[in-house]
Amino acid sequence: MRFKIKKCPKCGEYTLKETCPLCGEKTKLAHPPKFSPEDPYGEYRRRLKKETLGIGVKK
């Protein structure tokens, strides 16, 4: 069985548990998503980044 290390977004603690042992916050995977040359969600990710940063948006 493979274990994936997780990281607490609140305090930055690394653990193998679902919740942080220090603050009790739900942990997230510390690994990036698998690379794919086709990048099926690339368009959505770039659009969200532009909207979030306000790039190319007329005000």
Swiss-Prot record:
Any single Pfam family the record assigns to this protein: Nop10p
InterPro entries: H/ACA_rnp_Nop10, H/ACA_rnp_Nop10_sf, Nop10_arc-typ
Gene3D superfamilies in alphabetical order: H/ACA ribonucleoprotein complex, subunit Nop10
The entry's keywords: Ribonucleoprotein, Ribosome biogenesis, rRNA processing
Alphabetical GO biological process terms: pseudouridine synthesis; rRNA processing
Any GO CC annotation of this UniProt entry: ribonucleoprotein complex
Gene Ontology molecular function terms on file: snoRNA binding
Family: Belongs to the NOP10 family.
NCBIfam families reported in the protein's UniProt record: PRK13130.1
Function: Involved in ribosome biogenesis; more specifically in 18S rRNA pseudouridylation and in cleavage of pre-rRNA.
The protein's name: Ribosome biogenesis protein Nop10
Species name: Thermococcus sibiricus (strain DSM 12597 / MM 739)
Name of the gene encoding the protein in the UniProt record: nop10
